[in-house]
UniProtKB/Swiss-Prot annotation:
GO terms for molecular function: oxidoreductase activity. It catalyses: all-trans-beta-carotene + 2 AH2 + 2 O2 = echinenone + 2 A + 3 H2O; echinenone + 2 AH2 + 2 O2 = canthaxanthin + 2 A + 3 H2O. Keywords: Carotenoid biosynthesis, Oxidoreductase. Its EC number is 1.14.99.63. Disulfide bonds: none annotated. Pathway: Carotenoid biosynthesis; astaxanthin biosynthesis. Converts beta-carotene to canthaxanthin via echinenone. It comes from Paracoccus sp. (strain N81106 / MBIC 01143) (Agrobacterium aurantiacum). Pfam families: FA_desaturase (PF00487). Signal peptide: none annotated. It comes from the Bacteria. This is Beta-carotene ketolase.
Length: 242
């Protein structure tokens, strides 16, 4: 058994517990912010809630990403698809089918013109393409409908705008910078192999806070795509800083 392997039952149980914890925490902060939080009276709590939702929104996307690689519920593709679609809906109403097709293409053609996540331009143009790849007419129609429903339910409470779309937008920037642009930008450090991916030289706590280890261990992810995010640090051999 390799250093980063776990028995299938233990891997499944841990993945479900970790994923369930992230989803539950996101839902708790989401409900608290929209229905109970008085942001004007408790600005520090409101800021903490906002930052927490932003980070947990990154976590929702990472769960979907792991589900695409079959590592949330190993050996159960339908369960992975169900989990992936759930968290993508919570995150921004994204399509599971569209997302998984594009992401598998990214792994096959990482850092090339055939990579849907790659662009030769600067970070702003690259981010615009990155978002445009996944945010289409479906999402453009769905999100205003959801915001309208929230407006009808909550009345003049503006928190449904501040505490749902904005954390998702900031999370997308976080995902792009630490999980796409830094690992795959050309002309910075030489890539170690054909995956055209590098791992950022950051500590494990920073790696966790920025992109759930997909910044600090991005090259390792391309080497071991079925390893869940919380096991990525175990995939690096001692002394390896790639």
């Amino acid at each position: 058994m390799s250093a980063h392997a776990l028995p299938k039952a233990d891997l499944t149980a841990t993945s479900l517990i970790v994923s369930g914890g992230i989803i539950a925490a996101w839902l708790a902060l989401h409900v608290h912010a929209l229905w109970f939080l008085d942001a004007a009276a408790h600005p520090i709590l409101a800021i903490a809630n906002f930052l927490g939702l932003t980070w947990l929104s990154v976590g929702l996307f990472i769960i979907a990403h792991d589900a695409m690689h079959g590592s949330v519920v190993p050996g159960r593709p339908r369960a992975n698809a169900a989990m992936g679609q759930l968290v993508l809906w919570l995150y921004a109403g994204f399509s599971w089918r569209k997302m998984i097709v594009k992401h598998m293409a990214h792994h096959r053609h990482a850092g090339t013109d055939d990579d849907p996540d790659f662009d030769h331009g600067g970070p702003v143009r690259w981010y615009a393409r990155f978002i445009g790849t996944y945010f289409g007419w479906r999402e453009g129609l769905l999100l205003p409908v959801i915001v309208t429903v929230y407006a009808l339910i909550l009345g003049d409470r503006w928190m449904y705008v501040v505490f749902w779309p904005l954390p998702s937008i900031l999370a997308s920037i976080q995902l792009f910078v630490f999980g796409t642009w830094l690992p795959h930008r050309p002309g910075h450090d030489a890539f170690p192999d054909r995956h055209n991916a590098r791992s950022s030289r950051i500590s494990d706590p920073v790696s966790l806070l920025t992109c759930f280890h997909f910044g600090g261990y991005h090259h390792e992810h391309h080497l071991h795509p079925t390893v869940p995010w919380w096991r990525l640090p175990s995939t690096r051999t001692k002394g390896d800083t790639a």
